[in-house]
Design a protein with these regions (language model features):
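Loop-helix junctions at membrane interfaces
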Residues: 1-189
Length: 189
């Protein structure tokens, strides 16, 4: 009897957690909280629900939440454009790296059992994935849009990675560690 009940509860719990994290992602994507302007670039905390989803419910849930993050990146590029928004109209820049956050965060957590390590790797996946795609697909155009020498695109992108990436990792480690610990305590209760 108990195993039958447990089998039916698990999908419901997963659905609830997925809905909650998707709702948080939609809220962050719909408000200035999710994309924080820093000059023409934007720092983000939208990767946090993706990482939390990876740790709590696995890679498929996290990939779905990452898809929401990526779609909102594209919407932001249209609704609140900056001089560099053109790069986020490409799903290879805006969506693919955000979906990969869930995979890297999940497998890091599975190997290390560390929310901090998972948060770090997930955040770096976002930063390196997005900026790497920008460099590969739009390096010179990106630098020109920022009024910089096109030959210095790599240095410019590395500067953005450092300026945005380090604070994003720090915030992710603090928030993801605290939230996943709280959710695990609730789950055990």
């Amino acid at each position: 009897m108990y195993s039958e009940r447990a089998k039916s509860i698990m999908p419901v719990r997963k659905l609830v957690v997925t809905g909650m994290l998707a709702g948080v992602s939609i809220l962050l994507g719909s408000t200035p909280l999710g994309f924080i302007p820093i000059g023409p670039a934007k720092a983000t905390i939208m990767h946090l629900p993706v990482i939390i989803g990876a740790i709590m419910e696995g890679p498929l849930v996290a990939i779905g939440i990452g898809l929401i993050f990526g779609v909102f990146s594209m919407i932001q590029a249209i609704m609140a454009p900056t001089v560099i928004s053109f790069v986020f109209l490409n799903p290879l820049v805006a969506v693919l790296p955000r979906m990969l956050i869930g995979l890297t965060a999940y497998y890091t957590y599975k190997m290390t059992k560390s929310a901090a390590a998972s948060a770090t790797i997930g955040t770096l996946t976002n930063t390196i994935g997005v900026l790497g795609m920008i460099y590969m697909l739009y390096g010179a155009q990106f630098a020109a849009a920022l009024g910089q020498d096109q030959g210095k695109a790599a240095a410019l992108i590395l500067g953005i990675a450092t300026t945005n990436g380090i604070p994003e990792v720090i915030v992710a480690v603090i928030v993801v560690t605290a939230v996943t610990a709280a959710l695990k305590r609730i789950r055990k209760a």
